[in-house]
Amino acid sequence: MVNASGDPVIEAAHIWSDTLTVLKHSASLSPREKGWLEGVVPEGVFGSTIVLCVDNNDTLQAIQGDLNDSLLQALRTVTGENMFPAFKVVPKTEPEPLSAAKPAQPYPSEISPTVAEFGKESYGAKPVAAPREPMPATESQFPVGQQKMNRDPETHLNKNFTFDSFVPGDSNRFARTVALAVAEGSGQDFNPLCIYGGSGLGKTHLLNAIGNYALVKDPGLKVRYVTSEEFTNEFIDALQNPNQSQGQIAEFNRRYRQVDVLLIDDIQFLGGKEATLDQFFHTFNALHQANKRIVIASDVAPKNLKGFEARLISRFESGLTVDVKPPDLETRIAILRMIASMNGSKIPSDVLDLIAERFTENIRELEGALTRVTAVASLSNQPVTRALAEQTLQDFFTTDVEIKPTDIISQVAKYFHLTFEDLVGKSRTKNVAVPRQIAMYLAREMTSMSLMDIGQVFGGRDHTTVMHACTRISDRMQQKQEIYNYVMELTVRLKQSNTN
């Protein structure tokens, strides 16, 4: 099944072109599903693996999810044998939207997504209201101050993330204690250590702290921090050149199997990547048998990882699994004090208390709120006071004004260029389903209605459907900036429309 040219790039282009034709004529795929395939770019064929590039995680998840079986079948039809796709996420480089450069325009009316735009990769790069974006972009799971990423080129560790800058509390104290034991080399019984919890709760901070402390104890150690995406891309790169692939694979194996401490972040994103998981399995075994330290972080417990073979999950569970939870009030206040101290800012206690009381989900929320307050104070030449903080953050605080669910549906429909009937109707396409879930979430957050009553308003849906929608949007707000922006912008608009 090798193209006459012998060129893996040309071969991939031919295979993908034919595969795309097969998929486009498939009656089982919706136009929306076929649309996900348009932005896929073939990079090369290496044995039974075709490397495909996508420009964002939404496309990746769609293709690896609902489209996976259809894609495998189409590849089999075209090539006459089993061929497996390996994906690389290669973000597009796009110019900054003009609307983001106009802070004087607080509510750009023309940047709400149309039905055709909603969910497309090109739209995800645009914040809904750039001047009101509540949180700064950050690479860390547990940000402490507005510090630049200080990543070591060899170990990939962020030197700013240490145990000293990690604020302990009831929600994370056990995880920190175990992590410190692993870093000191006294936690042999905890190998591997698996840390899991929601986004923004400190997992990445702990991984980096382990590596940094281990090097302080023994500078001769070989330590490597890597995300699952980086591990995948390095493995795919090692396969790229057919003339040198054996040497590159050997180099890849040496790089990872000779480390003393391996720290791998966001392991859940390896799910379903069969070739990469097989490589990681052998890497894991080699390190574990050599008594090397392995620490992994995930958003779910090992037993709940999707797309992982039982043999790998059982190895994860053979060590110790610990979780990190959202911080309690005292810990949130302590975190804010740490952030302020590292920024060299003096923030009154009543301001820190206010922010800690109102922002409860994760550390990113806390830092974003504190950053917004200090920025407004600095730009307006005012001292940081509780009154200023309340005024600055009022858009994100709850209101005593009762908002009608029909107002929420109407506002969400208008925002996404849909109709009221679309949101209460039966359509399950993504460009309707996601706005509907957002509307249900807002109805739950901004009204006193029960889940059952909300379901009745949305076309007589079951209360479990509403519960699923609320959980889904709550989770995605932590994972995807654009979803967070949508909800915050709609919250502001609804509150304003009810106070006018």
Curated annotation (Swiss-Prot):
Q: What is known of its domains?
A: Domain I is involved in oligomerization and binding regulators, domain II is flexibile and of varying length in different bacteria, domain III forms the AAA+ region, while domain IV binds dsDNA.
Give positions of region: Domain I, interacts with DnaA modulators: 1-81
Query: What family does this chain come from, according to its entry?
Result: Belongs to the DnaA family.
Q: Name one Pfam family in it.
A: Bac_DnaA_C
Q: Subunit structure, per the record?
A: Oligomerizes as a right-handed, spiral filament on DNA at oriC.
PROSITE patterns documented for this protein: DNAA (PS01008)
Species in which this protein is naturally found:
Bifidobacterium longum subsp. infantis (strain ATCC 15697 / DSM 20088 / JCM 1222 / NCTC 11817 / S12)
**What's this protein's name?**
Chromosomal replication initiator protein DnaA
Region: Domain II, residue numbers: 81-155
Q: Give me the Gene Ontology terms describing cellular component.
A: cytoplasm; plasma membrane
